[in-house]
Design a protein with these regions (language model features):
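A structure-centric signal for secondary-structure junctions around beta-strands
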Residues: 8, 123, 179, 212-214, ...
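Alpha-helical substrate-binding/gating segment
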Residues: 203-215, 226-254
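N-terminal Rossmann-like NAD(P)+-binding domain of SDR-like oxidoreductases, especially those catalyzing
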Residues: 1-187, 234, 240
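Glycine-rich "substrate-gating" loop/helix at the edge of Rossmann-like oxidoreductase active sites
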Residues: 153-156, 187-199, 219-231
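Aromatic/pi-system hotspot detector in well-structured domains
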Residues: 102, 198, 254
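Alpha-helix N-cap/helix-start motif
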Residues: 21, 95, 137, 194-198, ...
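C-terminal structured domain segments across diverse proteins
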Residues: 146-148, 159, 182, 187, ...
Length: 254
């Protein structure tokens, strides 16, 4: 799978303690990669990261992507060949409660990571994960396309659009002729085992039903696509493989 490209490769994952990040750690370990992770904390109790005892199976670095010096020191210490950037403030409701934190994490955190990519010669490929909510929401019935307008009517969505813009600027300004091949990936809502986060429809339903309570749906009139967590992760891994092995121009993949 993935042409054995990850075997013995040094792979850094930001946001590795989260739902998708912990699944990505486990998959990369199974592929034979040497994995390191950088995250501010374990976001839920219980957590998929702790259930898999990943802190004992990878190089586990605790730090905030908003702290550029801490992130740079981690990158310089581990010297990764491939990077997956998943660290984020991922919740729309929290983005209303703390918009500054959301922009600092999702935009400035991405900027700090891009600076590491620019200055660490060991890195040959990087996948920067954003969101399908980076598009301007015009309430049409079909899926958004690569050439649709970026936007965001809430702080979370706008922060992801900002992350896309800064990533594109670095691609065009610094990585066209030298440096790592990088791409962004825009996934939608994910479901699957190991997700204990709040403001996620399936965990919220299970918690409410187990306590014989009604389920509080944040926006019952919304329509959103869902995919199993392993589907976008397979896309990230395929994209990372192509960026690393083929020096391809796989820019802004959704």
């Amino acid at each position: 799978m993935f042409k054995n490209i990850y075997q013995d490769k040094r792979v850094l994952i930001t946001g590795h303690t989260g739902f998708k990040g912990s699944w990505l750690c486990a998959w990369l370990l199974d592929l034979g990669a040497k994995v390191a992770g950088y995250s501010v904390d374990v976001p839920t109790k219980p957590s998929h990261f702790e259930a898999l005892a990943l802190a004992n199976r990878i190089e586990h670095f605790q730090g905030d992507v908003r702290n550029k010096d801490s992130l740079r020191q981690t990158v310089d210490r581990f010297c990764p060949e491939i990077v997956f950037h998943l660290a984020a403030q991922p919740l729309v409701r929290k983005s209303y409660e703390d918009p500054a934190l959301t922009f600092e994490t999702n935009f400035t955190g991405t900027l700090n990571l891009l600076e590491c990519l620019r200055n660490q010669p060991s890195i040959l490929a990087a996948v920067l994960v954003t969101s399908d909510k980076c598009y301007e929401n015009v309430e049409w019935l079909w899926g958004y396309r690569e050439n649709d307008r970026l936007g965001g009517k809430d702080p979370y969505s706008a922060s992801k659009a900002c992350a896309e813009l800064i990533s594109k600027a670095y691609m065009e300004s610094f990585f066209k002729e030298k440096g790592p091949n990088i791409a962004t990936a825009r996934a939608g809502n994910v479901i699957g085992g190991g997700d204990w986060a709040f403001d996620r429809i399936i965990p919220d339903c299970i918690r409410a039903w187990s306590e014989k309570k009604s389920v509080a749906i944040r926006n019952p009139n919304a329509t959103r696509p869902w995919q199993h967590v392993l589907e976008p992760l397979s896309g990230y891994l395929t994209l990372g493989q192509k960026l690393y092995s083929e020096n391809s121009v796989c820019k802004n993949q959704s």
